[in-house]
Amino acid sequence: MQTEAQEEGDKLVLHYHDVVIRQSVSCNLSRSLIALIDCLNEQDLDTLAPGQWLNDTMIEFHMEFLERTFVPKDAKYLFLRPGMVHLITYAEGDVMQLEPALPPQMDQYEAIFIPINDGNPHKAYSGTHWSIMVYVRAVSSFYYYDTLKFNNLRDGELSSKRIQPLLKLKKPTQFIPSSTPQQINGSDCGVSVISIIDYTLHQLLKSRDKKDQVHYDKIMILKSKDMSTPKQVRDNINGMIKRLQQRCKTSCSSSSSSSTTTSSSSLNK
């Protein structure tokens, strides 16, 4: 399916699972690198520059990368995409009616990472600030992190209440506003969210084999030293994209050589 941006000639940079980054040459990667839900264009990539506000698609790309390369297959961790969180939070009526459109068996996940945005309830992609909430099933708790003085606290609380029925819990959940290192400008909320996702994911994975002994209120505490700097996050994502792009080029080259060889063999028969 083409988007308006594709029709206008944006370049394909990379095709990675549920995310496409456009540049001049497309390529066929192995099955493990193919899927399409959303598109990253050059304007999206520009949000990685210092001082720029990270948009939805870059956060989705990072989540996709973690799912495919970092999280063990037997770990039941869910990364809800920003658009899905918006739908759950603001759709009218009973949230259970949305189940067919949501990831199956949400009640079975050990942890759910939930990006929060202060956007207009009636307009997607309209917010100005990101925060992050992590649901931990073992303690029925939503840990809420905000790098701008709990700017999105009410949005986080609303999202947690809307998500609760989908989790089919037998006991009430806790919403825990967690102390969070604060950003020093108005543009680093998105990269801070990525840093927090990385750290809390690491903490949860590290504790998987000793669940009965884990004090989640301790391991989910976040301090400044635990977070990557905004520059580190931006550089890491840029580097990630370049490495995947190189894999794409290598795959393209191999596919092209294979195709040429096959064609030549056919002509010689």
Language-model features: locations:
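Long, low-complexity, serine/threonine-rich intrinsically disordered regions
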Residues: 252-267
